[in-house]
Every structure is written in structure tokens, then in C-alpha cells.
Amino acid sequence: MQIILLEKIGGLGNLGDIVTVKNGYARNFLIPAGKAKRATEANMKEFEARRAELEAKQAEILADARARQEKLDGQTVTVAQKAGVDGRHNGSVTNADIAAAIVAAGIEAVKANVRLPNGPLKAVGEYEVEVALHTDAVAKITVAVIAAAE
């Protein structure tokens, strides 16, 4: 299905690009989320009429994400969990735990923003983690996993 992107989507394209995606991806995710419209003549004309408004909105979203990136870059976030004698956790530190620690530090983040390429953190130590606030604004933070006092 041919669609017009209404915002920049990583791995797909930029605002205003006409791309071909699978029908289910367009119908079930992109169109209901307001990220795209079908590439019909009427929708193309409507998009061109609203292009400046959409570009301004995207610039505002990117500026907000970059401001949060400035606050977050280089920060150290501490997460405490029960650990055994050998320093391994009974459970693991997930992206939800890290997002909660970031929010506790006073910066807006959701678990979908936290990137853990090697999976959940299972041992005590310090880890470099990326927080993708926008496709063009990725902050690098240090997560210090410590053993909780019992």
C-alpha cells in the first residue's frame, strides 16, 4: 500500500515521503496512529495544504526531544535490586525499571524509549544505555545497578 508519511519514521522515511508498506502495517499501525495517510490524490492535495503546519509541529517535537536529550546525556541513573552473594540478580533490570528511574530523576521517559540491545541487565555494575527520545535525538546514560539493602 502506498502511503504519505505525516512524520519522520526511523527506517521508513521522512515527513512527506510517499512509501510502499505492507497493508497490515499501514492499516493497523501507521494510519490509526496518525503517522500516515493513504496516498490518494485527495490526501496528497490535503497534505500539501497542511505541509507547513506539519513541518512546524515536527520541528517543535524535535526541539523538545533535543532539550530532553541535553538534560539526559551523560546522566547516571541508579537502580537497586536484590542480588545474591555473587552479584547476580534473582530477577533482572528491564527497560521499564530504567524508565521509572529516569522519571524519578525528573525527566520524562517511557519504557519504549529505553534501548537494551543485549537484553535485561542481570548483574550488579554500570552499563551504558541509549534512550531514544526521537529518531534524531538519542541520549546515552549510565545505569548503575546496585544490590539493594536488605
Curated annotation (Swiss-Prot):
UniProt KW Glycoprotein keyword: no
For this UniProt record, the keywords arranged alphabetically read as follows:
Ribonucleoprotein, Ribosomal protein, RNA-binding, rRNA-binding
Pfam families from the UniProt entry: Ribosomal_L9_C, Ribosomal_L9_N
Gene Ontology annotations of biological process type: translation
Cellular component (GO) terms are: ribonucleoprotein complex; ribosome
Listed GO MF terms: rRNA binding; structural constituent of ribosome
Q: Does the keyword Ribosomal protein apply?
A: yes
| InterPro entries from the UniProt entry | Ribosomal_bL9, Ribosomal_bL9/RNase_H1_N, Ribosomal_bL9_bac/chp, Ribosomal_bL9_C, Ribosomal_bL9_C_sf, Ribosomal_bL9_N, Ribosomal_bL9_N_sf
Domain of life, per UniProt, equals Bacteria
Q: Which family does it belong to?
A: Belongs to the bacterial ribosomal protein bL9 family.
Function description: Binds to the 23S rRNA.
Q: HAMAP family, alphabetically?
A: Ribosomal_bL9
- Name of the featured protein: Large ribosomal subunit protein bL9
Which organism encodes this protein?
Answer: Neisseria gonorrhoeae
Taxonomic path: Bacteria, Pseudomonadati, Pseudomonadota, Betaproteobacteria, Neisseriales
Gene name for this UniProt entry: rplI
